């Protein structure tokens, strides 16, 4: 799996933006990716030092359109803590 396939997109929420000020970034990642793979991908793609990673599996929600019921896909979220004083400049403009 390519490093660019592991990182899907940054999480866009108020809580994620508040974490950016403390050097904590949140990303949606491939559900099959492991913590060492995620760490290597973040370090190589953004050129930063990752100090810690927390991951969580987010189950898909039940959605309904009229009488038809379906489910959103299950996702995996990674919360990445960077070394002191480091930032991901590509995401700083979004906050």
From Swiss-Prot:
One of its GO terms (biological process) is translation. InterPro entries: Nucleotide-bd_a/b_plait_sf (IPR012677), Ribosomal_uL23-like (IPR013025), Ribosomal_uL23/eL15/eS24_sf (IPR012678), Ribosomal_uL23_CS (IPR001014). It comes from the Bacteria. One of its GO terms (cellular component) is ribosome. Signal peptide: none annotated. Transmembrane segments: none annotated. Keywords: Ribonucleoprotein, Ribosomal protein, RNA-binding, rRNA-binding. GO terms for molecular function: rRNA binding; structural constituent of ribosome. The keyword Calcium does not apply. Part of the 50S ribosomal subunit. Contacts protein L29, and trigger factor when it is bound to the ribosome. One of the early assembly proteins it binds 23S rRNA. One of the proteins that surrounds the polypeptide exit tunnel on the outside of the ribosome. Forms the main docking site for trigger factor binding to the ribosome. Belongs to the universal ribosomal protein uL23 family. This is Large ribosomal subunit protein uL23.
């Amino acid at each position: 799996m390519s490093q660019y396939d592991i990182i899907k997109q940054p999480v866009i929420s108020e809580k994620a933006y508040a974490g950016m000020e403390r050097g904590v970034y949140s990303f949606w990642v491939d559900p099959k990716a492991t913590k060492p793979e995620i760490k290597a991908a973040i370090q190589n793609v953004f050129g930063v030092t990752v100090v810690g990673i927390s991951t969580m599996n987010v189950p898909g929600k039940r959605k309904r359109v009229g009488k038809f019921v379906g489910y959103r896909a299950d996702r995996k979220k990674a919360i990445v803590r960077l070394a002191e004083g480091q930032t991901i400049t590509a995401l700083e403009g979004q906050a």
